[in-house]
From Swiss-Prot:
<dbReference type="GO" id="GO:0015934">
    <property type="term" value="C:large ribosomal subunit"/>
</dbReference>
<keyword id="KW-0934">Plastid</keyword>
<dbReference type="InterPro" id="IPR002677">
    <property type="entry name" value="Ribosomal_bL32"/>
</dbReference>
<dbReference type="GO" id="GO:0003735">
    <property type="term" value="F:structural constituent of ribosome"/>
</dbReference>
<dbReference type="GO" id="GO:0006412">
    <property type="term" value="P:translation"/>
</dbReference>
<dbReference type="InterPro" id="IPR011332">
    <property type="entry name" value="Ribosomal_zn-bd"/>
</dbReference>
<comment type="similarity">
    <text>Belongs to the bacterial ribosomal protein bL32 family.</text>
</comment>
<keyword id="KW-0689">Ribosomal protein</keyword>
<keyword id="KW-0687">Ribonucleoprotein</keyword>
<protein>
    <recommendedName>
        <fullName>Large ribosomal subunit protein bL32c</fullName>
    </recommendedName>
</protein>
<dbReference type="GO" id="GO:0009536">
    <property type="term" value="C:plastid"/>
</dbReference>
<dbReference type="Pfam" id="PF01783">
    <property type="entry name" value="Ribosomal_L32p"/>
</dbReference>
Length: 47
């Protein structure tokens, strides 16, 4: 017979969520830095 799983605590859920958000923030920061570099190179190439 199927038994419902125990509910994940709010603190554990928030911990995992904050971890995911922190990693996403780092990735977004890297992507933005790379985009800025590419844009600078393209602008300097024209001059």
């Amino acid at each position: 017979m199927a038994v419902p799983k125990k509910r994940t605590s709010k603190s554990k859920k928030n911990l995992r969520k904050s971890q995911w958000k922190a990693q996403a923030f780092v990735q977004a920061k890297k992507a933005l830095a790379k985009a800025k570099t590419v844009l600078k190179l393209l602008l300097n190439k024209d001059n």
